């Protein structure tokens, strides 16, 4: 009885002292991100082409999806290339992806950050996805490639 009480007290103290960021993220957020990167790891995989409005809306929250779609439509009318001239998930146009590691942490109510590290053509790459949970699942709110501008900033500044 005393041993059980000590265990419960120690467990309670451990939980109370654990940093908030160390609490496990929603497993569905991790599954969402892992599903994004799975097609890149298959030999001759097609990745995740953002060639339709439905595809864009599947991965991005509504405001970012609208920015991407509007930009793509304007570029098509001009006969030009859209602002997003590379694959935003891997920060490249070509790929041979290996050693993918996905780390997701909760950052608030219905929000999370996923840090995705991988090798592309042998070069270490890290992409950070800001995630938001909507009624129909997790979506990307922004992408940071370690440069000055994020995905959202590419379209807002334009």
Task: Give residue spans per PLM region.
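Surface-exposed, charged secondary-structure patches
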Residues: 60-123
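Short, solvent-exposed secondary-structure junction/capping segments
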Residues: 41, 45, 50-73
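N-terminal export leaders
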Residues: 4-9
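Short, low-complexity N-terminal intrinsically disordered segments enriched in polar/charged residues
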Residues: 11, 19-51
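Low-complexity, intrinsically disordered terminal/linker segments enriched in charged
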Residues: 107-111, 115, 119-128, 134-135, ...
């Amino acid at each position: 009885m005393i041993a059980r009480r000590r265990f419960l007290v120690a467990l309670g103290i451990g939980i109370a002292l654990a940093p908030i960021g160390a609490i496990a993220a929603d497993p569905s957020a991790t599954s969402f991100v892992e599903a994004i990167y799975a097609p890149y790891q298959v030999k001759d995989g097609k990745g995740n082409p953002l060639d339709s409005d439905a595809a864009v809306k599947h991965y991005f929250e509504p405001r970012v999806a609208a920015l991407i779609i509007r930009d793509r439509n304007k570029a098509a009318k001009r006969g030009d290339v859209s602002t997003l001239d590379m694959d935003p998930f891997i920060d490249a146009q070509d790929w041979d992806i290996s050693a993918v590691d996905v780390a997701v942490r909760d950052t608030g109510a219905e929000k999370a950050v996923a840090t995705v590290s991988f090798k592309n053509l042998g070069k270490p790459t890290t992409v950070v996805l800001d995630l938001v949970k909507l009624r129909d699942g997790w979506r990307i709110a922004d992408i940071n490639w370690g440069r000055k501008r994020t995905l959202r900033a590419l379209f807002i500044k334009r």
